[in-house]
Amino acid sequence: MGYLVPTVIEQSSRGERAYDIYSRLLKDRIIMLTGPVEDGMANSIIAQLLFLDAQDNTKDIYLYVNTPGGSVSAGLAIVDTMNFIKSDVQTIVMGMAASMGTIIASSGTKGKRFMLPNAEYLIHQPMGGAGQGTQQTDMAIVAEQLLKTRKRLEQILADNSNRSLEQIHKDAERDHWMDAKETLEYGFIDEIMENNSLK
């Protein structure tokens, strides 16, 4: 079942203007990254990041994150774009940042990574596999690619936290959930936000 996207009506000197809520938030440099990370969603997030950076790269972009994770390639495309643009990207985790969501949320500008008090973080090793009827050589290729991907993601998590690569590897061996305080101690965020004090 779908959900209704609210419309916001604004008054101006030239009359009324209606926006869907996401377009209105974009005017205030707010991007909502919600739901599974997949190619279509990533393309939309990337386009919004590029648009806001081209509009004014001296102002921060606010990326609100609530995702169970998803595609590694789609998520890394978002992370690469966040690093590519000149604007600082503030990340605000609400609900959860799990799996690829953790990579994205922790890749915000250092000092500007936030989390709401009841949100959660999850790190784990990447998942994938070969389909039924796959040849043994293809399975070996998939396994090798998964190991490479795991190393790359763990390096990003180590760079984005105050933990060693070895600690990340150990903690990501199985699902490792963290509440806001644990995430702050881990170094993935810089502050737990009780109210909206973003600048």
Swiss-Prot record:
Belongs to the peptidase S14 family. GO terms for cellular component: cytoplasm; endopeptidase Clp complex. CDD domains: S14_ClpP_2. The active site is at residues 99, 124. InterPro entries: ClpP, ClpP/crotonase-like_dom_sf, ClpP/TepA, ClpP_His_AS, ClpP_Ser_AS. It is found in: Cytoplasm. The keyword Hydrolase applies. This is ATP-dependent Clp protease proteolytic subunit. It catalyses: Hydrolysis of proteins to small peptides in the presence of ATP and magnesium. alpha-casein is the usual test substrate. In the absence of ATP, only oligopeptides shorter than five residues are hydrolyzed (such as succinyl-Leu-Tyr-|-NHMec, and Leu-Tyr-Leu-|-Tyr-Trp, in which cleavage of the -Tyr-|-Leu- and -Tyr-|-Trp bonds also occurs). It comes from Lactococcus lactis subsp. cremoris (strain MG1363).
